[in-house]
Amino acid sequence: MANFKGHALPGSFFLIFGLWWSVKYPLKYFHQKGLKKNRLSLQQQRIEIIEGAVKALFAVIGILAEQFVPDGPHLHLYHENQWTKLMNWQHSTMYLFFGVSGIIDMLTYLYFNIVPLGLDRVVLAMAVFVEGFLFYFHVHGRPPLDQHIHSLLLFSLFGATISICLEVILRDNIVLELFRTTLLILQGTWFWQIGFVLFPPFGTPEWDQKDMDNVMFITMCFCWHYLVALCITAINYSLVYCFLTRVRRRAEGEIIGIQKLKSDHTYQSTLLSGSDEE
């Protein structure tokens, strides 16, 4: 959809997943760090399956929104000797690949003895690459600001593609996972930024899309967005660490208290038995 909602919708999807990953991966990392064997628990497998299902659901919602809005193509690709709403079809194609990624995620953890390890990462990398590939040819012939603000998104997309491909080999690498998380948060916030710049809501003035000062500002703004993504990821990582540390200390305190009660009970029993003998 070539409007504000058409950019806010995918931006919200990516931002939700980015924020979720910024909590999930630190939790997973600290949990596995305390285990002798680096294996997923049943609870973690269920979380991964649910995440894949949510990803597929988001993709279906995105496709339906692109196809069946009032001015959408309604599944008509070619009508009356011309292509129909190709921009909506491009967005639908992007959602389609992320939907496939969600399905593969579910299969990977439902049938982990059959599905090769790393296939979920390969398909996710493919989905992100397809998104970047579509966006590269998405803005040809448009004003400079429109082209530039979309092209900046390619850096995060192709960077994420490379990072995810490395995860196929370096499985459960927290650095690569957090790097991917920051890029996804950046992608989500940047979709919103594109919507505010190209389709200003609330009656705000439109941007001059031929002004090179606007192009320079948007480049700087992109860097600010990534800094915010880094800060969000770092803050959530720290909060998870503090939360788990507090829970662990509380659990250790309860164990020590129970052991102390047992020792006191044993001591009292010994005294009573000694007094009975006397």
UniProtKB/Swiss-Prot annotation:
It is a multi-pass membrane protein. Plays a role in innate immunity. Belongs to the TMEM45 family. Keywords: Endosome, Golgi apparatus, Immunity, Innate immunity, Lysosome, Membrane, Phosphoprotein, Transmembrane, Transmembrane helix. The keyword Membrane applies. This is Transmembrane protein 45B. GO terms for biological process: innate immune response. It is found in: Endosome membrane; Lysosome membrane; Golgi apparatus, trans-Golgi network membrane.
